[in-house]
């Protein structure tokens, strides 16, 4: 139920109050609020932290920035001490971390602590992406998520979440509290913007034809190089498509199913959009490993359906 009526001033609704009206468990309310609290420390690190390298590599052989490591530590510590999490997986960790033994009412969390961290030194927007499952199994279909969210650290700090009952945006105010700014965000069937990731000269022929189709119908290119701000643009404008397709030499693209694709697909689908790897809905992929990757086309349902036609899906 909306918290305000047309023509009336909307009073501030904080995140915890909104969650308590979603008919979810107290433990899940607590978990989402703990992640929101952690993000306040992450944004402080982004604004004031070390922009250098950490001297370590993650599971994928990528050099870790000091901000990656610090952001991961902040979120992991909050999850461990929440008391409602059993298993934790992070893009910056080599394996699943067990916070406590399995028990009723616990959740597992997969997250990318600071997606797009290499953009911080040029002062572009970055974000945290979170996927939540009931129980202790993380390697399952994204459709089994009970919640997903991202926090965008841009000119404003915004938190977008869904527990399967609409998609809602909260904005951090001057007191560092998240208050409701948009409720029940929805996608239009068609859009006129596109965000294409990957080097275009490495696109497969079918992907190149799809991009040419988008250009021929007048779609405008809008791409920042950050997954969170680019998805946020598509979602908040309610139109458009983001893609990171299969490439020559990288048939599975770049983005990880568990940490990036599943939570974003969950949010976009709950807003009325769609997400596919070109043949299969992202949320129906059953990951076999933490580092599994897949191509993605995500956004307006008709644009995604057209992408599938070009990909032969």
UniProtKB/Swiss-Prot annotation:
Annotated metabolic or biological route of this protein: Carbohydrate biosynthesis; gluconeogenesis
Signal peptide bounds: none
Entry keywords, A to Z: Carbohydrate metabolism, Cytoplasm, Hydrolase, Magnesium, Metal-binding
Cellular component aspect of the GO annotation: cytoplasm; cytosol
UniProt keyword Hydrolase, yes or no: yes
Chain residues that bind Mg(2+) 1: 91, 112, 114
Binding site for Mg(2+) 2: 112, 115, 260
GO term, biological process aspect, one: fructose metabolic process
Cofactor: Mg(2+)
Transmembrane segments: none
Subcellular location: Cytoplasm
GO molecular function, one term: fructose 1,6-bisphosphate 1-phosphatase activity
Similarity comment: family membership: Belongs to the FBPase class 1 family.
Record field: catalytic activity: beta-D-fructose 1,6-bisphosphate + H2O = beta-D-fructose 6-phosphate + phosphate
Oligomeric and partner information: Homotetramer.
Pfam families: FBPase, FBPase_C
Binding residue positions for substrate: 115-118, 223, 254
InterPro entries per the UniProt record, alphabetical: FBPase_C_dom (IPR044015), FBPase_class-1 (IPR000146), FBPase_N (IPR033391), FBPtase (IPR028343), Fructose_bisphosphatase_AS (IPR020548), SBPase (IPR023079)
Source taxon at top rank: Bacteria
EC number: 3.1.3.11
CDD domains named in the record: FBPase
Name this polypeptide is given: Fructose-1,6-bisphosphatase class 1
Gene: fbp
